[in-house]
């Protein structure tokens, strides 16, 4: 038996996510600010960033994380294939409001005919953090609220795949939550997003 390690062409993670979905690829063909970038900058400004101690994360590492998220999204679509086929679940692509663009992961029509924003995340952190979303998931909640405002709904869901579960022992798991917003909550969060973008000079 001869075992030889090899690198495919194109290599991983590019083979998984493709050049258009790499973290370094532009999301939009113009200069409009992207919701995710605004929220990430807001988080850094208020000390809620998701950076790590020590050396900054590399582009290659970011792309591996992106590959993990891409895999979860595609497996999730397969698990909900009936809704995908009948057209009640879809990926909307780019949406825009007040000069800001965003790309919700999925939109779904609920039983009452209402629109639901569906956000999919892959995390290596402990699944216990899901017990307190407002503490540990400020960026994700802000992102979901932004998408909800952009598409005109108060209904949303967050589905998180935890690669190592709660780490005791490290067994994969998934957790999900329905998040119902008030119009006031969405207005306040959106106002903060737009205001931050203007202060940074990203919006006129």
What are these regions (language model features)?
Residues 1-115, 130, 138:
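Metal-dependent nuclease catalytic cores that hydrolyze phosphodiester bonds in DNA/RNA
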Residues 87-196:
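Mg2+/Mn2+-dependent nuclease catalytic core
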Residues 204:
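Beta-rich carbohydrate-recognition modules and glycan-binding surfaces
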């Amino acid at each position: 038996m001869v075992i030889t390690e090899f690198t495919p062409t194109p290599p991983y993670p590019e083979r998984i996510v493709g050049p258009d979905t790499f973290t370094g690829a532009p999301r939009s063909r113009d200069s409009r600010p992207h919701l995710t970038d605004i929220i990430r900058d807001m988080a850094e400004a208020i000390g809620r960033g998701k950076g790590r101690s020590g050396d900054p994360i590399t582009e290659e590492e970011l792309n591996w994380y992106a590959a993990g998220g891409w895999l979860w999204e595609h497996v999730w679509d397969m698990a909900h294939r009936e809704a995908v086929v009948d057209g009640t679940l879809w990926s909307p692509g780019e949406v825009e409001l007040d000069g800001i663009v965003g790309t919700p992961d999925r939109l779904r029509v609920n039983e009452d005919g209402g629109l639901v924003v569906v956000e999919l995340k892959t995390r290596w952190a402990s699944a216990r953090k899901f017990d307190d979303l407002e503490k540990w998931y400020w960026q994700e909640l802000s992102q979901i609220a932004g998408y909800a405002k952009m598409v005109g709904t108060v209904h949303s869901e967050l589905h998180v795949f935890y690669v190592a579960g709660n780490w005791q022992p490290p067994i994969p798991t998934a957790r999900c939550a329905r998040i119902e917003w008030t119009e006031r909550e969405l207005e306040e969060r959106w106002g903060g997003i737009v205001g931050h973008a203007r202060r940074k000079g990203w919006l006129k």
